[in-house]
Amino acid sequence: MSLRVAVVGSGPAGSSAAETLVKAGIETYLFERKLDNAKPCGGAIPLCMVDEFDLPPSIIDRRVRKMKMISPSNIEVNIGSTLKDDEYIGMCRREVMDGFMRDRAAKLGAKLINGTVYALDLPKSSNQPYTLHYTEHREDGLVGDNKSLQVDLVIGADGANSRVAKAIDAGDYNYAIAFQERIRLPEDKMAYYEDLAEMYVGNDVSPDFYAWVFPKYDHVAVGTGTMRVNQAKIKQLQAGIRARAAKRLEGGEIIKVEAHPIPEHPRPRRVVGRVALVGDAAGTVTKSSGEGIYFAAKSARMCAETIVEFSNGGQRIPTEDELKIYLKRWDKQYGMTYKVLDLLQTVFYRSDATREAFVEMCSDIDVQKLTFDSYLYKTVVPANPLVQMKITAKTVGSLIRGHALAPTRSW
């Protein structure tokens, strides 16, 4: 037999899965409903992703080597002095990166289908196929015919609003709302953001997350995020970041407005039968940072590698238990990272006082090195005991001082 796999969604997750599968000689169908889609996203990727996923310099708009953390009382902390000359955070436009990764998978042999999957029929037995029903889109932009495809396995890489997840009753998760404006700045203003990104914290920009100004190709992405319970306030919070960064954004022109949900924890069920969820569909976005691009691509690759392994290179159909090994490996490798970032958000994002403490703590060189090493290389890097004791003591001191620094506001 020859294994047939459908990958629904061609962002970093779907394209990574498709590439891994097709390299192993597995018949792979890659679905994308909108080939020119520009997903709302800060667009930051860690250094390890560039090498690990063989990303060319052409898709990286900016190499950020400096960060500013800006507290509720507008105290600024500069971060980046611990970076080596060849270290940076890559800033990308999702439409550029996604297009590159999707095209690469297609050139390697994945069958790219420009269509919207609207239903998934589940098999009644373990040896029957899954049937995907989809509407094909034509090159002229018009809706084409309704079609169907039968496959042995399905990978759901179709984002936070995953239809694949709904089809297998994967369960819901809490999510945040990200709102972002792309703003083209005058040349002198854009020069300020040449290799600099900014993160703002405070109740005025988000009661439970942060706001950002990230540089892109010829503009900046200015946005904020908040949990869905505060969704009605999102435009008020966006006005908050625009006000805080007003001088630096002066003369800017809004060229695009975007909004998108961000998962806040994994779905209750990520593998059901012979269907596996990856990326945002699975809920791999980290708390505290809201980062999802690397973890989306990595989860998808690990899922696809598991399929290759247990299908003997496409010669048999893996079982549900075999697919779940991908989750065990994922949780073993990254479980601690998620726990640490969850704790960080719980401790430091709960009030303006704790946010003041967080920004102050970021001024410490040991904290900066620990944070950047963990971000750039995607590991929770343990500090030596003396450094850890020092960081703990500074954290306590910062929390105490933060209560004195926090601005008094009524909302």
Identify the residue ranges that each predicted region occupies.
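Beta1/beta-strand and adjacent pyrophosphate-binding region of the FAD-binding site
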Residues: M1-G11
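FAD/FMN-dependent oxidoreductases across multiple families
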Residues: V229-I307, S311-N312, P318
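Glycine-rich FAD pyrophosphate-binding loop
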Residues: S10, V22-C41
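C-terminal helical "tail/cap" subdomain of flavin- and related membrane-associated enzymes
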Residues: V308-W411
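Predominantly flavin-linked oxidoreductase catalytic cores and closely associated redox partners
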Residues: R104-L249
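N-terminal Rossmann-fold NAD(P) dinucleotide-binding loop
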Residues: G14
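N-terminal FAD cofactor-binding segment of flavoenzymes
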Residues: N37-P72
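Short beta-strand to alpha-helix junction loop
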Residues: L83-D103, M227-Q236
